[in-house]
Each structure stands twice: as structure tokens, then as C-alpha cells.
């Protein structure tokens, strides 16, 4: 090899290295929708078409959709309907079910870790003013699961974090996140007091069950009747999760929520990858993720 050839090779090495580690890209579609009075299903269906269709992704498969129902139903912003502010809107939920069913999905399971309860998700939806029967009739095989506890399953599922985990080596979640072929994050576009913004990845922070990661989680066993949030465990690191889950890797590193929550989100994104992200930004709020944040 001549000196000139060697210099040319060295000059291109950084480019080759950068290309080797370039993250994968995915198609994105966006549409303007002035209000939920418009045909939300038509708008969403057109965006699916722009992505190349969803039939290959969902046909004859179980699809699990994580929605955003942050906070108790009785906490409202200026008395407005929850879907107009900080919840995923039920029309978006129904439109998603309809389109997945039309694309051939075998089972459509909507999940959320409902605040302060391990009871049926349908009850929380009814208390939120949602028409559960209408959602059930949007497509064949529609189900609901509250993933804040064990729910309808017989065991929890362990999701190991590949590579170098930030916070926990693995996360123990409701069975619904494992017993699925396709995982969808149906998020609400809004600010977040700690993370800045809530989108598809931050929505999945709510996968962690309060029965294990909650303030009133059992020490040795999960508390299947949780009534509190995850502040002490996930936000502040004041205690470890229930022994049903592995403890934090570096418990004395940082107890600031601004550090901890984004790193938990990053862990979960690789432990339970998202196949399809849908973000509901038709109507929302600014200043925080819900009415409990001052200034919202």
C-alpha cells in the first residue's frame, strides 16, 4: 500500500464508522385535523396508506395498544373532557381499532396502567366518560387490560434490557406486553413537567405496574391492589421495586427525576420495542402532562 492509498483510507475511516452506527429510519406520516368532529378514521387511514399500509404488520396477529390515560378520571382541566386535554381521545382509540380490524388483526387489546387501581380498565374508561360498547364494536376481538397489576394474567413477564441498561437490568410488566405479536404506542401529544414532552416513547413509561414499582408496592411480593403512583421508585429512587423485579443497578447514582425518568424510558424502549407509534395531537394542553401540574 502506498502512502497516498494509506492516507485516503484513513480519511474515509470516520465516515465508514459513522455509517456503520447510523440508526435505522422509519417512514413518518402527518396530517392536519382541526377537531375530533372531523373523520378521524379517514385521516388516520390515509396516514397508514402513506406508510405503505399496515396489513402486513397486523394481519392475523394480536395487536396490543398502549393508550395514555394519565391521572385519575376526576382530575380535569377547566372541566373539559379528558380526551380534549391529557388523555388519548376515545375517537382516536375507536378509529385505531376500526382500522386495525379492517387490516385483518385477529385480536386488538387496549392497555394502560390506570391510576390508583388494579381493577378493570373498562371501569376506568366508563368513569372517564368513554363509550366502552362502541369501542368494543369498532372491530372484532377488541379487549381491554389494566396493566397496573397482574390483571387477567397468571404471571408477570420479565423484559431484559439489552446492551448496557441505564436504570434496571430488566423490567417486570403485565403479561399483555409479552403475549402479543405487534406493540403500538397510541400517545397523547403534550408537554411533560419533567421530560419536556410526552410522545410515543414517554407514553410507555406507564407500562410499569404500580403493583411492583408503585409507592405502596409490596416489598417481597407485588401489591395487587395499588392505590398510588411510582414517585418513590421510578421518579426519586427512594426505595426499590418489589422483589418480583430486579433492583436498580446503581441506586446511589442520581435521585433527580429529570435524570431518572428519561433513562427509564430509554430502557423500556429497547426492552419492549414499539412497532407502530401513533400520536394524538388534535387537541391537547401545554405546560405539563395533566392538571396536577401548576400552570396547566
Provide a role label for each language-model segment.
Residues 4-21:
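N-terminal export signals
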Residues 21-296:
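Extended, low-polarity segments enriched in aliphatic/aromatic residues
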